[in-house]
Amino acid sequence: MEMDGDPYNLPAQGQGNIIITKYEQGHRAGAAVDLGHEQVDVRKYTNNLGIVHEMELPHVSALEVKQRRKESKRTNKWQKMLADWTKYRSTKKLSQRVYKVIPLAVRGRAWSLLLDIDRIKSQNPGKYKVMKEKGKRSSRIIHCIQLDVSHTLQKHMMFIQRFGVKQQELCDILVAYSAYNPEVGYHRDLSRITAILLLCLPEEDAFWALTQLLAGERHSLWYSTAQILPGSRGSYRTRSRCCTSPSQRS
């Protein structure tokens, strides 16, 4: 199929096929990232959270050095706790450490254990792949998703490339979830929540983390369908805090 035409002038199914093909082919199939005419070391423009700034960042301050040392000590404490998860999983100490912010180095593992991702994956072998393929049949949803994906965390180094790896994973998860939970389908708030999960989790793990947050026994009251669909600013702040209080406050 010719890829150079405008996909939005094609019938719905044609639009969906072209969008999916662009993501599958990766960044080279899409628009180039504008980094200027000269090659630059992007690390000089990227902060510790992965946000790419327009200007080169100043050298690390004494305060930042102190904060990093503190983060390292907290990471060691978390590593010991994660290694003995059965002992700590339902304790007050765990809750306190979560609200103090989970260190970035162990955040993915902590989220995985908190959301019981390994268990839900083992109970649903191959389910994510099936849902991903099923979701790709809905061109209307794919069109909505790709518009939001292109504007999600677009200044973060993992999502800065149009049709890059992380944008592809984000699109795939949202497409799969729309098929997995048709009652919710797709809502634009899901794009940012899922992208934050992808910062610390592999693709399939991020999918199951999303399902646990939206429908798991422990979290379903926070992420009911009624809360998500209105998309109000207040309910979005509540959902973001429940989902990502560690990363949003780091």
Curated annotation (Swiss-Prot):
Keywords: GTPase activation. SMART domains: TBC (SM00164). SUPFAM superfamilies: Ypt/Rab-GAP domain of gyp1p. GO terms for molecular function: GTPase activator activity. InterPro entries: Rab-GAP-TBC_dom, Rab-GAP_TBC_sf, Rab_GAP_TBC_domain. Residues 101-250 form the Rab-GAP TBC domain. PANTHER family: RAB GTPASE-ACTIVATING PROTEIN 1-LIKE, RAB-GAP TBC DOMAIN-CONTAINING PROTEIN. This is TBC1 domain family member 26. It comes from Homo sapiens (Human). The gene is TBC1D26.
